[in-house]
C-alpha cells in the first residue's frame, strides 16, 4: 500500500494538497452560523443523487408524467423514500440558502474584496429558486400545471417583449408538452450545470480570499 501511495505522491504531491486543505486558518469569530453554506451544498448533493435516481423511472410527457411519479411512489423499491428525501431536501436547501444570504449580508461578507463571491452567491440563489419552480411542475398534476401557467404568464406584463418571453418559456402560446420538456431540461441539466459551475467559482474565491473578518 505504501508503494502505491508513494507512486501517486511522487507525481501528484498529494500530501502537500492535504496539508493545504487541513491547515487552512479559521478565524476565531467563526461560529455555527458559518456552516449554513456547507449545509446548503450538502442539500444540493442530496438533490443531485435522488434526482438522478428518479430519472430512471420518470417520463417527461404530459400523458405519462403523473403516472410515472405514482409508479415511483408505489411500485419502485424505496421510490417513496427517494422522492420524499428529494422533496424534503429541496425545502431545506431553500431555507438554508435564505439563512446563508442573511448571514453573509448581516456580517458584511459581501464587501470588498469579496464582491464577486457575493455575485456568484446571488446567482446560485436565483438558480435555487428556479429549481423549485421547474421541479414543481414535473409531476404534471393540477397543482403543477396551474403553477406553470401562472409563473410563465407573469412576464406577459412586460411591455414589448413580454409576449415573446412567455412563448419562449412555454414553447408556444399555451402550456403543454413543449413547456414540460423545457422545464424538465432546465431542472435536470441546465440548472444543475450552472449551479455546479458557479459553486466551483464560489468555493475557489472563498479558498483564495478566506472567510471575512468580524464586524
From Swiss-Prot:
Q: How is the polypeptide modified once translated?
A: The N-terminus is blocked.
Residues passing through the membrane, by range? 32-52, 90-110, 116-136, 186-206
What's the protein called, per UniProt? Cytochrome b6
Q: Where does heme b 2 bind?
A: 83, 86, 187
Sorted UniProt keywords: Chloroplast, Electron transport, Heme, Iron, Membrane, Metal-binding, Photosynthesis, Plastid, Thylakoid, Transmembrane, Transmembrane helix, Transport
How does this protein lie in the membrane? Answer: Multi-pass membrane protein
Report the main location listed first in the record. Answer: plastid
Q: How is the cofactor bound?
A: Binds 2 heme b groups non-covalently with two histidine residues as axial ligands. Binds one heme group covalently by a single cysteine link with no axial amino acid ligand; this heme was named heme ci.
Cofactor names: heme b; heme c
Q: Where does heme b 1 bind?
A: 37, 100, 103, 114, 202, 212
Organism in which the protein naturally occurs: Chlamydomonas reinhardtii (Chlamydomonas smithii)
What GO cellular component entries does it have? chloroplast thylakoid membrane; membrane
State the encoding gene: petB
Q: What role does it play?
A: Component of the cytochrome b6-f complex, which mediates electron transfer between photosystem II (PSII) and photosystem I (PSI), cyclic electron flow around PSI, and state transitions.
Chain positions recorded as heme c binding sites = 35, 207, 211
Gene Ontology biological process terms, A to Z: photosynthesis; respiratory electron transport chain
InterPro entries linked to this entry: Cyt_b/b6_N, Cyt_B6_PetB, Cytb/b6-like_sf, Cytochrome_b_N_euk/bac, Di-haem_cyt_TM
Which subcellular locations apply to this protein? Plastid, Chloroplast thylakoid membrane
What is a GO molecular function of this protein? Answer: electron transporter, transferring electrons within cytochrome b6/f complex of photosystem II activity
* Protein family per UniProt: Belongs to the cytochrome b family. PetB subfamily.
* Assembly notes: The 4 large subunits of the cytochrome b6-f complex are cytochrome b6, subunit IV (17 kDa polypeptide, PetD), cytochrome f and the Rieske protein, while the 4 small subunits are PetG, PetL, PetM and PetN. The complex functions as a dimer.
Keyword Repeat listed? The answer is: no
Amino acid at each position: 500500500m505504501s508503494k502505491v501511495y508513494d507512486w501517486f505522491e511522487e507525481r501528484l504531491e498529494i500530501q502537500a494538497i492535504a496539508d493545504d486543505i487541513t491547515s487552512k486558518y479559521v478565524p476565531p469569530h467563526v461560529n455555527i452560523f458559518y456552516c449554513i453554506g456547507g449545509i446548503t451544498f450538502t442539500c444540493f448533493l442530496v438533490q443531485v443523487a435522488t434526482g438522478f435516481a428518479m430519472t430512471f423511472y420518470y417520463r417527461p410527457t404530459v400523458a405519462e408524467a403523473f403516472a410515472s411519479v405514482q409508479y415511483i411512489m408505489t411500485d419502485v423499491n424505496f421510490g417513496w423514500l427517494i422522492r420524499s428525501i428529494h422533496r424534503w431536501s429541496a425545502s431545506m436547501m431553500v431555507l438554508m440558502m435564505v439563512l446563508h444570504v442573511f448571514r453573509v449580508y448581516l456580517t458584511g461578507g459581501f464587501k470588498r474584496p469579496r464582491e464577486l463571491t457575493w455575485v456568484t452567491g446571488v446567482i446560485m440563489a436565483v438558480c435555487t429558486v428556479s429549481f423549485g419552480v421547474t421541479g414543481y411542475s414535473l409531476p404534471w398534476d393540477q397543482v403543477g400545471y396551474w403553477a406553470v401557467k401562472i409563473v410563465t404568464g407573469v412576464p406577459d406584463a412586460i411591455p414589448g417583449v413580454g409576449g415573446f418571453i412567455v412563448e419562449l418559456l412555454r414553447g408556444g402560446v399555451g402550456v403543454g408538452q413543449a413547456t414540460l420538456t423545457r422545464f424538465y431540461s432546465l431542472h435536470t441539466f441546465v440548472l444543475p450545470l450552472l449551479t455546479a459551475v458557479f459553486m466551483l467559482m464560489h468555493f475557489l474565491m472563498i479558498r483564495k480570499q478566506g472567510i471575512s473578518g468580524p464586524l
